[in-house]
């Protein structure tokens, strides 16, 4: 499954990053963190800074709303910032794919012992979707399919994030006419289904 961030055409691409930062801030708030979005400190900009309300652990989050593969140096830079700022953890949250080198670093890092591995966490599409499901922010794509009552779904279901709402975009194949229609399913209002036919 894919996650797309959608903004008005008049807005800059930095707005996509803000949507992702805001989403991460909401998820961290649920997990008992006090959150500050986009702060500038000497020599760096931090997308999301969070401090846990109970154990006072600190977290730096780098949010990347990129469509192209994320280069490995983004991971190195985040890890350096975590060390320089004496943070307890760093999160890399990316809606796009990781480059080959970045995948290699992620794999190496996730094979470290628990104490080392806890310093850096990677959240790509599957893990972001898990966080959203577990926090109750979205319902599963399977639940959406049941509501839409169609037998012919295409595989490329997408979660579309906008500034205010989240939608599942579900391609439905029409075997009779050889067309694909898209149903957008609004997360906050389960009865509100919009259908757009594409010929």
Describe each PLM feature range.
Residues 1-199:
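Mixed-charge (Asp/Glu-Lys/Arg
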């Amino acid at each position: 499954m894919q996650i797309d961030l959608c903004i008005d055409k008049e807005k800059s691409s930095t707005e996509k990053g803000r949507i992702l930062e805001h989403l991460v801030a909401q998820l961290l708030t649920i997990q008992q963190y006090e959150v500050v979005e986009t702060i500038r400190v000497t020599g760096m900009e931090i997308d999301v800074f969070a401090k846990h309300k109970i154990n006072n652990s600190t977290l730096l989050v780098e949010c990347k709303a990129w469509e192209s593969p994320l280069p490995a140096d983004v991971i190195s830079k985040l890890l350096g910032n975590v060390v320089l700022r004496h943070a307890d953890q760093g999160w890399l949250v990316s809606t796009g794919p990781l480059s080959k080198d970045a995948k290699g670093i992620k794999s190496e890092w996730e094979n470290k012992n628990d104490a080392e591995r806890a310093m850096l966490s990677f959240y790509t599409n599957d893990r972001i979707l898990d966080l959203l499901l577990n926090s109750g922010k979205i319902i599963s794509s399977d639940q959406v399919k049941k509501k839409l009552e169609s037998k012919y779904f295409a595989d490329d279901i997408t979660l579309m994030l906008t500034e205010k709402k989240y939608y599942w975009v579900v391609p439905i194949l029409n075997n009779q006419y050889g067309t694909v229609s898209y149903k957008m399913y609004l997360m906050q209002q389960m009865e509100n289904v919009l259908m757009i036919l594409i010929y």
